[in-house]
């Protein structure tokens, strides 16, 4: 379905369930999609960080998009990551995901190669010129090692190059500058500013953000939808209480032993363990070479679920 302008609400970055031999587990993926739709989300973002897009082969990426788009059948917009190191590779992904039915594409700045802001701007202009669907920028400096500047984002928004921004930078001052700048700019309309944080959704919405793309919404979509609704209703006391409950639940991402695994292994392993414990996916496997959680660490995830009333 066409992406609303602006896109608002809760748009989970959908986890990619895998089989024990690391193929895409399509039945589990579709159960997860049903879980999210039943939770009342406003859109789905596949092939992002929580989707383990960086680990998926091109064949797997296309299968994910085709499966999700076919299953939702236009009920919700499906945004698909077209994330790769350089512009030519991203343009290939744009073609593949849009042929598979994606309603919008999401792209980071180029990475691995050393780039200049002028080249980042050219990157997005080329993507928009070749994409038949709207383009969202994904600000993820922890992974791509460059920050999308406020002036650049607003310039590209005013040109119509970008339909929105998913901000996972952790820079709340910069996020506020984009929110207020987009609102004040006479040449910008329908531009969506989305926080990628699980922990400050209430404050992001209070400052004027359009919605959120929280990975934890895979586990508890109802909670984030409830939080969004409370914020929109101006019930800030109950919204704060719901945000605090979700912050406590988010503690699961730290169950993994930092001495033997990276942060992504711990966080994504926790999300998948939670989905497995809740009976939504068949296997909690993460993509190689991520280190799996131990039985004791998975038990710890279960305690977080129980504490949040989800198990």
Please annotate each region the language model reported.
Residues 26-33, 150, 295-305:
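Short, amphipathic alpha-helical "lid/cap" segments that border enzyme active or binding sites
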């Amino acid at each position: 379905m066409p992406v609303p302008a602006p896109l608002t609400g809760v748009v989970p970055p959908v986890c990619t369930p895998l089989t024990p031999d690391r193929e895409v587990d399509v039945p589990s993926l579709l159960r997860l999609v049903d879980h999210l739709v039943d939770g009342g989300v406003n859109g789905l973002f596949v092939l992002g960080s929580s989707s383990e897009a960086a680990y998926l082969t091109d064949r797997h990426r296309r299968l994910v998009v085709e499966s999700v788009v076919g299953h939702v059948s236009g009920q919700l917009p499906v945004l698909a990551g077209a994330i790769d190191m350089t512009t030519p590779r991203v343009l290939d992904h744009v073609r593949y995901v849009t042929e598979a039915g994606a309603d919008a594409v999401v792209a980071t700045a180029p990475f691995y190669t050393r780039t200049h802001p002028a080249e980042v701007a050219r990157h997005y202009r080329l993507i928009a010129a070749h994409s038949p669907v709207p383009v969202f920028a994904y600000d993820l400096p922890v992974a791509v090692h460059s920050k999308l500047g406020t002036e650049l984002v607003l310039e590209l928004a005013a040109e119509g190059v970008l339909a929105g921004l998913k901000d996972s930078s952790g820079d709340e001052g910069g996020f506020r500058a984009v929110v207020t700048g987009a609102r004040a700019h006479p040449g910008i309309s329908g531009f969506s500013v989305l926080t990628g944080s699980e922990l400050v959704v209430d404050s992001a919405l209070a400052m004027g953000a359009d919605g959120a793309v929280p990975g934890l919404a895979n586990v508890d979509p109802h909670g984030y939808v409830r939080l969004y609704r409370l914020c929109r209703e101006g019930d800030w006391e109950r919204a704060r209480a719901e945000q605090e409950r979700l912050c406590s639940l988010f503690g699961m991402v730290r169950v993994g032993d930092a001495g033997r695994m990276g942060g992504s292994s711990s966080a994504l392993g926790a999300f998948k363990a939670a989905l497995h414990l809740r009976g939504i996916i068949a296997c909690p496997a993460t993509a190689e070479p991520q280190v799996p959680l131990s039985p004791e660490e998975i038990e710890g995830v279960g305690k977080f679920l129980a504490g949040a009333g989800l198990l």
